[in-house]
Amino acid sequence: MHRLLILVLCIPAYGQTLCPATPTYSICDITFDIPGTMPRDTELNAEFRGPSHRTFLVRAFRSFGNRLTVRFSPSEAGPWDVRLSSTLAQFHDKQFQITANPSDSNGWIEPANLHHFRYTGGAALAALTPPHLWVGDTLPVISGTTLESWVTARARAGVTHVRMQVPNLMDEAAFDELDVRLALVNKQNMVADLVLTPPAGDRQAREEFFRYVIARCAARNVTWVILSDFEKFPHARDLVREISSYLDEDPFHHPRTVGATVTSGVFADEKGMEFREYGSPDWRISAVEDQIYAKPAVSVIQAVSADEFRHQLWNDTMSGTYPEAVTTDPAMLTYLGVWKKAFADTRHWELEPFFDVDNGRGLSLPQTEYLIYIEKPGPVVVRLDGKHKWNVEWINPLDGQVIESKDLKDENYNGSTPDNSHDWVLHIYREGHKEGLKSYHFESRPVLMQDVEVDAGKVPFEIAQPAGDTIPAAAAVPYAAKLKRETKASRNMIYLWTGEVTADGEGYRVLGTATSGEFHVPAGIVHHFPATLHMRVYGLNGLGKLYSLDQNFGIAQ
């Protein structure tokens, strides 16, 4: 997608400039020049009605002092009727038409198939729209030719998303620079993940700011990230809900999430939150929450070394998340490109976490393919769904080299990594069966969420600590889970400890992910005393069954 040059077609009576015939999912700017002084409370809205009679209401934003710009992106080819409403009499209730031409764009993205994404366009029927593979990187503070080179390098590596910060002031020069970045990214068919931070000021100032952002940016191919790390903001839940209410005015309904230091799962059930974000390098958090929330997720991967980056990339993937990287080393970009190529050759939009493996973590589409990450090289055992002819290959996550192995005709794979010098990825698949599934354009099977076992009598562990009914507000608190009975599945239990002060409404925070350890009551979740901490402990066993226990503790000041 690209920014079009404005056609010099002016209607003097209205001071109006239209855009030329515009390819679908490309920018169409319609400008209105206002003579004299324009009142601060001036409003101009445009209702676009497409060939299929779907309508979009778009606000104008102010630019160049006395200019109003309506920025739109048509989603289908053909004539679009435009009707204006405005506080300015010369524009109110005026009508005209623009034209959209067909393009090869697949459109915006949207959540699909529980934990994945698809495009909104690119096919005549919604059910036939292509899947979207999220591969993200984060834009550093650069400009000019350096910016162009950076974007080009990401496109070559297969990156499909670029994360960037939106200015938190209504500064026209800053937003002009943002427009340049957005145009470069979208031109390479990459989505811009826009991180939103509120300006200083009251609610009225925030509303004015976010309306400006939506009017100026929503016609681009974007997603919205509310706050960078919500946990750092006081009364974060109210602030997130407020900003989300402004985003409800996005006429294109781009996906949104909340930026998190640890997890935005606390907002997963909120209106409009369409995917989750993880900022913690601890893959256990997303592994457990993938079994709880029927929404896709991305992990922000920040690592000091390239090796650490690669391990986190693949571990987070096996937890069911897509990568949103912060590459600070050329090797990191190489590893991200290897990841992209590996998944582009799979039915990635149908893969879900797979647990029946020894010395590895996996994803699978039953009866079709398995992708297993072996972090510690050595022997690996994979119990497959049925005795079929399976193709087997090893992928080197450092350079993408593929080593083909002997075909397998069994329901179990027993083998070892090609060498023990680094981590490996094992790909087991049925080539002929995968080819046959091409007639299923998106979903070849129903995907259901499991029911979490909450019956204490059936949960294979208990809360051993904290002991007693009260915990301190400021001191370290020990926590521990104790297995009631040990089995092969329970020996590999993954725990997630969360705490919430329900009365104060901030939602839960992660307290720990180990069998035992210590935590401090997060300050941001307690506003009033006396207070009660609602603790919940999840246990995900080695076969993928999820359990939970709850217990309340008074918080002593």
Model-derived segments and spans:
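Aromatic- and carboxylate-lined catalytic core of secreted/periplasmic carbohydrate-active enzymes
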Residues: 16-21, 38-43, 295-299, 305-406, ...
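Short, solvent-exposed loop/linker segments at the N-terminal edge
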Residues: 19-25, 36-39, 469-476
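Active-site mouth of glycoside hydrolases
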Residues: 43, 89, 103-275
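Extended acidic/polar, glycine-enriched regions
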Residues: 56-114
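Short beta-strand segments within Ig-like beta-sandwich modules, predominantly Fibronectin type-III
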Residues: 60-62, 406-408, 509-516
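Short, solvent-exposed loop/turn segments at the edges of extracellular beta-sandwich modules
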Residues: 87-89, 539-545
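Extracellular glycoside hydrolase catalytic/binding regions
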Residues: 222, 228-334
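Surface-exposed, flexible coil segments in extracellular/virion-facing regions
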Residues: 500-520
